[in-house]
UniProtKB/Swiss-Prot annotation:
One of its GO terms (molecular function) is structural molecule activity. Belongs to the FlgI family. It comes from the Bacteria. Its main location: periplasm. GO terms for biological process: bacterial-type flagellum-dependent cell motility. Pfam families: FlgI. NCBIfam families: PRK05303.1. This is Flagellar P-ring protein. The gene is flgI. Keywords: Bacterial flagellum, Periplasm, Signal.
């Protein structure tokens, strides 16, 4: 019986504390992506390119490209192009990217092109913040949207002014890396948490020996590693696969003010409170009345007199009790019982936090 109770307690503890790998909670400082950007031309469009009269930079770019190919356009030539579009090309250089490796690129129209569907990106250099060329992009663009127009009517599905080229860029220059230099590496938590940082350090010390890891702050854990690239790779592979029990997160409610969506995690709780909500609507209706004389030759004038009607209505407003809720399901039931719309719910949650009834951080994005 004692063994059964011990096994049951151990099962409950492991269920409450969810174990995750260190690699899912942290990243290695210095091992990151680097943004690249470039400006280029897309050709081969089916009459959906830039209107060159409104986007002179497209014509200027085309003239510069033709001159580099040995073709001279006479001065003053007015090229009415419909199959060319000026675009911006963006992508990130992955960590440890090697010369000759291919990466995907995103192509976005910067002029007034109607669609990039069916277009081909001409060779475009991709530069970093240091103005050095790190990759060259070129290829056919895949656009996820579709559209058609005829007789003044048009239909469009998804976005047509942006697309993607799979393996569309080739890395030409490698970024220098400091990996393997020195005897320490820093692991950075995805979310700052003092207890989690200390727990990861303790886990590494239990396996690798005391003093192998030190929590510097709520986000950084410094780890002592052997020198040399290959030794550090093996050391990090072992550390990143270690299991750590994840402690409960901070209670948080995230509100998107643009879309009206409300998201909360499982740690959110409510205290008992009373909520009154109501809607106030004001309707203004203005009409123009025409007054004409009764007789055609009576000397009167035809006048227009405006007539305005204002209607103010207020609905709801009765107090409703919200019970104390200790779990996410109970919180959802309590808020749904109010019958509030998502937009009303945002104001209610803000007021509940001010009143001390919402036990969570409120973040508005």
């Amino acid at each position: 019986m004692i063994k059964f109770l011990s096994a049951l307690i151990l099962l409950l503890v492991t269920t409450a504390a969810q174990a995750e790998r260190i690699r899912d909670l942290t990243s290695v400082q210095g091992v990151r992506q680097n943004s690249l950007i470039g400006y280029g031309l897309v050709v081969g469009l089916d009459g959906t390119g830039d209107q060159t009269t409104q986007t002179p930079f497209t014509t200027q770019t085309l003239n510069n490209m033709l001159s580099q190919l040995g073709i001279t356009v006479p001065t003053g030539t007015n090229m009415q192009l419909k199959n060319v579009a000026a675009v911006m090309v963006t992508e990130s250089l992955p960590p440890f990217g090697r010369q000759g490796q291919t990466i995907d690129v995103v192509v976005s129209s910067m002029g007034n092109a109607k669609s990039l569907r069916g277009g081909t990106l001409l060779m475009t250099p991709l530069k970093g913040v240091d103005s050095q060329v790190y990759a060259l992009a070129q290829g056919n663009i895949l656009v996820g949207g579709a559209g058609a127009s005829a007789g003044g009517s048009s239909v469009q599905v998804n976005q047509l002014n942006g697309g993607r080229i799979t393996n569309g860029a080739v890395i030409e220059r490698e970024l220098p890396s400091q990996f393997g230099v020195g005897n320490t590496l820093n692991l950075q938590l995805n979310d700052e948490d003092f207890s989690m940082a200390q727990q990861i350090a303790d886990t590494i010390n239990r396996v690798r020996g005391y003093g192998s890891a030190t929590a510097l702050d709520a986000r950084t854990i410094q780890v002592r590693v052997p020198s040399g690239n290959s030794s550090q790779v093996r050391f990090l592979a072992d550390i990143q696969n270690m299991q750590v029990n994840v402690t409960p997160q901070d209670a948080k409610v995230v509100i998107n003010s643009r879309t009206g969506s409300v998201v909360m995690n499982r740690e959110v709780t409510l205290d008992s409170c009373a909520v009154a909500q109501g809607n106030l609507s004001v309707t203004v209706n203005r009409q123009a009345n025409v007054s004409q004389p009764d007789t055609p030759f009576g000397g009167g004038q035809t006048v227009v007199t405006p007539q305005t009607q204002i209607d103010l209505r207020q609905s709801g407003g009765s107090l409703q009790s919200v019970r104390s809720s200790a779990s996410l399901n109970n919180v959802v039931r309590a808020l749904n019982a109010l019958g509030a719309t998502p937009m009303d719910l945002m104001s209610i949650l803000q007021s509940m936090q001010s009143a001390g009834c919402l036990r969570a951080k409120l973040e508005i994005i």
